[in-house]
Amino acid sequence: MDVTNILLKPVLTEKSYLNQMGELKKYVFAINPKATKTKVKLAFEIIYGVKPLKINTLIRKPVTIRNGTKYPGFSKLAKLAVITLPKGMDIAITGEKTTKKETKDQ
């Protein structure tokens, strides 16, 4: 599987923005349903140049959607990865430059 086919796109919602404001930055990405945590970690390191602290994955299963006709529709299957970065690290998703904040170790 190619690196560009693992991380499909960032998921930008209100909840994902709130996770980015904390001390440990958490970013949510839509990923290939066949991707594993190790492949996601390698792809993230290659693309963004930052080693993630933790990766959680979840599968959003298809649900029935009413569309006003006799036959119901279904939403798409989606696999998401919540990637936690180490303290003081940050990445740019929306086109901003990546910054590394220096922290004082005590």
UniProtKB/Swiss-Prot annotation:
The gene is rplW. Keywords: Ribonucleoprotein, Ribosomal protein, RNA-binding, rRNA-binding. Coiled coil: none annotated. InterPro entries: Nucleotide-bd_a/b_plait_sf (IPR012677), Ribosomal_uL23-like (IPR013025), Ribosomal_uL23/eL15/eS24_sf (IPR012678). GO terms for cellular component: ribonucleoprotein complex; ribosome. It comes from Mycoplasma genitalium (strain ATCC 33530 / DSM 19775 / NCTC 10195 / G37) (Mycoplasmoides genitalium). SUPFAM superfamilies: Ribosomal proteins S24e, L23 and L15e (SSF54189). The keyword Ribosomal protein applies. Disulfide bonds: none annotated. One of the early assembly proteins it binds 23S rRNA. One of the proteins that surrounds the polypeptide exit tunnel on the outside of the ribosome. Forms the main docking site for trigger factor binding to the ribosome. It comes from the Bacteria. This is Large ribosomal subunit protein uL23. GO terms for biological process: translation. Pfam families: Ribosomal_L23. One of its GO terms (molecular function) is rRNA binding. Belongs to the universal ribosomal protein uL23 family. Part of the 50S ribosomal subunit. Contacts protein L29, and trigger factor when it is bound to the ribosome.
